[in-house]
Regions:
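Intrinsically disordered, low-complexity segments enriched in small/polar residues
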Residues: 2-63, 72-128
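Exposed beta-strand face motif in extracellular beta-rich ectodomains
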Residues: 67-69
Length: 128
């Protein structure tokens, strides 16, 4: 095999592997808080402020991410800060076409774990 062809194949393989590790994921947060409470979420990813969202009871909001997604969340007097997407931690755990589905409840944040086919508590609210 000539050198140019070998190099071209190597470059193509490297780029395809790099592209697959930078896949986009969707982080979805669903509000399942008691008393029809609103959930306020302010997120940042890769140094970008993604703004503040108010998620009403039994509704959700999604972000498309490939890097760490860190969010401040609050409802009533309860506040917390959570990494709701970390590619090293979550890439293999998320389901449904690269979607990390979070359900926010009174006791904390639950993630649907694809391998276990169920929601599992990942983060408790501070003070719980």
């Amino acid at each position: 095999m000539n050198t140019l062809l070998t190099f071209s194949l190597f470059l193509l393989l490297t780029l395809s592997l790099a592209g697959s590790s930078m896949a986009d994921y969707k982080a979805t947060v669903f509000n399942n808080l008691p008393g029809n409470a609103n959930l306020t979420v302010h997120c940042q990813s890769a140094g970008s402020d993604l703004g503040t969202q108010t998620i009403t009871y039994l509704h959700d909001f999604s972000w498309t991410v490939s890097n760490l997604l860190n969010c401040d969340m609050s409802w009533g007097n309860v506040k917390g800060n959570f990494d709701i997407f970390d590619p090293k931690r979550d890439a293999s755990r998320c389901a449904y076409g690269n979607t990390c589905f979070w359900r926010v409840k009174e006791d904390g944040l639950y993630l649907f774990i694809q391998e276990h086919k169920r929601l599992e508590l990942q983060f408790k609210w501070p003070g719980n």
